[in-house]
Curated annotation (Swiss-Prot):
The gene is Rab28. GO terms for biological process: intracellular protein transport. It comes from Rattus norvegicus. It is a lipid-anchor. NCBIfam families: small_GTP. The lineage of its organism: Eukaryota, Metazoa, Chordata, Craniata, Vertebrata. Its cofactor is Mg(2+). It is found in: Cell membrane; Cytoplasm, Cytoskeleton, Cilium basal body; Cytoplasm; Nucleus. The modification N-acetylserine is found at residue 2. Keywords: Acetylation, Cell membrane, Cell projection, Cytoplasm, Cytoskeleton, GTP-binding, Hydrolase, Lipoprotein, Magnesium, Membrane, Metal-binding, Methylation, Nucleotide-binding, Nucleus, Phosphoprotein, Prenylation. GTP binds at residues 21, 24-27, 38-39, 41, 44, 71, 129-130, 132, 160-161. It is an enzyme of class 3 (hydrolase). This is Ras-related protein Rab-28.
Length: 221
């Protein structure tokens, strides 16, 4: 195969991650791109970039450019520019925070406006994060599924903390954008286990302790 033929098998996709500041967007992007979970909560100001190259069926190499948009940018002058040109949009909410789910209407409104102006239609995925906190859920699954059905979204439930279905979410979004169908064996083959640290959302200084820091396993699917 020539160099030009090899290059033709490489694709780049722009994936924009939107949602409220506490929905876990940055943790989601970090778990996918770096296979880890941050020790401290860090608010995204403006936007952050993450890159990861994956291989889809047919030996197709795809580089995902993940744009993590700060939650405070809603209503800002730059948001439409961040969204412009995206092939995929992840609308992320915290399943334990109903307000973060309701606010997705505002985020999606901006996406629709940009899509109409640019005459392009990105794939939109609804992502319910923090499924490791199922016992604290305030957004019922039927609400999630109804929102998907009403707007034609793909549906995903993940945990950036444990890594549950994180890789699978991005993999499925990329495959759907490119019109590639994943079979069961390919999905199972993508499952791996990596080390991840548990986040501390308390921004106050931590007191000293003689106990070693806790950690968990981030099972990226």
């Amino acid at each position: 195969m020539s160099d030009s033929e090899e290059e033709s098998q490489d694709r780049q996709l722009k994936i924009v991650v939107l949602g409220d500041g506490t929905s876990g967007k940055t943790s989601l992007a970090t778990c996918f791109a770096q296979e880890t979970f941050g020790k401290q909560y860090k608010q995204t100001i403006g936007l952050d970039f993450f890159l990861r190259r994956i291989t889809l069926p047919g030996n197709l190499n795809v580089t995902l450019q993940v744009w993590d948009i700060g939650g405070q940018t809603i209503g800002g002058k730059m948001l439409d520019k961040y969204i412009y040109g995206a092939q995929g949009i992840l609308l992320v909410y915290d399943i334990t925070n109903y307000q973060s789910f309701e606010n997705l209407e505002d985020w999606y409104s901006v996406v629709k406006t940009v899509s109409e102006e640019s005459e392009t239609q990105p794939l939109v995925a609804l992502v319910g994060n923090k499924i490791d906190l199922e016992h604290m859920r305030t957004v019922k699954p039927d609400k999630h599924l109804r929102f998907c059905q009403e707007n034609g979204f793909s549906s995903h439930f993940v945990s950036a903390k444990t890594g549950d279905s994180v890789f699978l979410c991005f993999q499925k979004v990329a495959a759907e954008i490119l019109g590639i169908k994943l079979n069961k064996a390919e999905i199972e083959q993508s499952q791996r286990v990596v080390k991840a640290d548990i986040v501390n959302y308390n921004q106050e200084p931590m007191s000293r302790t003689v106990n070693p820091p806790r950690s968990s396993m981030c099972a990226v699917q």
